[in-house]
Amino acid sequence: MTTDTEINPESARPEAHGSLSVTVEFTGGLEMLFSNERKHSVTLPARLSDGGRPSISFLLEYLVKNVMKDERKELFMLEDNVRPGILVLINDADWELEGEEKYELQPADNIVFVSTLHGG
């Protein structure tokens, strides 16, 4: 099951460049923090108010504020990054190969978060 989530206007202001859709998946128990749904289709602005593209860092903040229904943010994030023990894949590649949280999202990217602490 896929959940479609539109951008909250208060999170970022879309520019005239349209929107950007990515697929986000949660496994290894993380889906419990996101309404027990593994796959989410997320629409973000293609350009942010500063003119840049949304990054994984922006996506993390967006997910916590707009998609995560569980109040236990600390199970997913530690400060401004994912918790240790959560593997992040960008289009099936380890995010460390792509620049981690600085990676700029592209149309149709598939971002997967796997908790290795829960059998991931």
Swiss-Prot record:
Give the organism, scientific name: Aspergillus oryzae (strain ATCC 42149 / RIB 40) (Yellow koji mold)
Database matches in Gene3D superfamilies: 3.10.20.30
Q: Where is this cross-link: Glycyl lysine isopeptide (Gly-Lys) (interchain with K-? in acceptor proteins)?
A: G120
Highest taxon of the lineage: Eukaryota
Q: Where in the cell is it found?
A: Cytoplasm
- Pfam families for this protein: Urm1 (PF09138)
Note the InterPro entries from the entry.
Beta-grasp_dom_sf, Mopterin_synth/thiamin_S_b, Urm1
Question: Which keywords are on file for this protein?
Answer: Cytoplasm, Isopeptide bond, tRNA processing, Ubl conjugation pathway
Please give the name of this protein.
Ubiquitin-related modifier 1
Q: What does this protein do?
A: Acts as a sulfur carrier required for 2-thiolation of mcm(5)S(2)U at tRNA wobble positions of cytosolic tRNA(Lys), tRNA(Glu) and tRNA(Gln). Serves as sulfur donor in tRNA 2-thiolation reaction by being thiocarboxylated (-COSH) at its C-terminus by the MOCS3 homolog UBA4. The sulfur is then transferred to tRNA to form 2-thiolation of mcm(5)S(2)U. Prior mcm(5) tRNA modification by the elongator complex is required for 2-thiolation. Also acts as a ubiquitin-like protein (UBL) that is covalently conjugated via an isopeptide bond to lysine residues of target proteins such as AHP1.
In which family does this protein belong, per the annotation?
Belongs to the URM1 family.
* Modification sites for 1-thioglycine: G120
An example GO BP is:
tRNA thio-modification
Give a short account of its post-translational modification.
Answer: C-terminal thiocarboxylation occurs in 2 steps, it is first acyl-adenylated (-COAMP) via the hesA/moeB/thiF part of UBA4, then thiocarboxylated (-COSH) via the rhodanese domain of UBA4.
Gene encoding it? urm1
User: One GO term of the cellular component aspect?
Assistant: cytosol
Pathway noted in the entry: tRNA modification; 5-methoxycarbonylmethyl-2-thiouridine-tRNA biosynthesis
